[in-house]
Amino acid sequence: GEKLQPNIMQLLKKGSEAVREASKDSGKDIKIAVHYTNIENNSEVYDRAEDLKNAKVDYDVFGLSFYTFWDGTYENMQRVAKTLRENYGTDVMIAETSYAYTSEDGDGQGNSFVGTDDIVEGYPATVQSQATVVRDVCAAANEVGAIGVFYWGGTWIPVGKATDDNSAIWEKFGSGWASSYCADYDPDDGGLYYGGCAWDN
């Protein structure tokens, strides 16, 4: 993948141009969203917004990942969203969020959410807490004018222990893990690990 910001901006500009053209050809108002993670590091997010502005990338929505167990407080998420709206004139959405309903392993592979280390105070790893976190994220985002929230990985549930049989099926039909088809883009991980699901809770 491309790692230099000027080159990334050029790719985003070309992608944006293609979407605008498709939007015009189809007669549909297709919104363009960019999506960034690690919002606990405010300056990094603002740097990306500056890069987009300086490169004149045409987009409508700035998407943010927000996980309560990785990305800081609700207040920080709100501060970032508000700053982006006010300083860059863009709509903002929470492009991905989720929370675990259990800390148990379901397929013999490691999980992204690992037991007590990732549990947020007030939200034990239960079905009710998962629902409460989603509701609280939606409420916090709405308070600062975000246009929407997307739940991430709703299909990432375990299907049993990772076996060679499962790996062959996932390789053929696809899965949520890094199959060999991504080796050109991600040679360090493509098809090499996570024969199950990295997020099965």
Where are the language model's segments positioned?
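Active-site cleft segment of glycoside hydrolase catalytic domains centered on the general acid/base Glu
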Residues: G1-D51, V57, G72-R79, N166-W170
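The substrate-binding groove and active-site-proximal loops of carbohydrate-active enzymes
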Residues: E2-P6, N38, S65-D71, I119-S129
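Hydrophobic, Leu/Ile/Phe/Ala-enriched alpha-helical segments that form helix-helix packing faces
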Residues: G15-S23, L52, L84, V134-A141
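Short, well-ordered coil/turn segments that N-cap beta-strands
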Residues: S26-K31, V57-D60, Y88-D91, G145-I147
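Active-site beta-loop-alpha junctions enriched in small/polar residues
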Residues: H35-E40, L64-F69, T97-A100, W152-W156
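Flexible, glycine-rich surface segments
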Residues: A49-G106
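Conserved, mostly hydrophobic/aromatic
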Residues: F62, Q130, V149
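Aromatic-rich peripheral "rim/lid" segments of glycoside hydrolase catalytic domains that contact
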Residues: R79, T83-E86, T102-G115, I119, ...
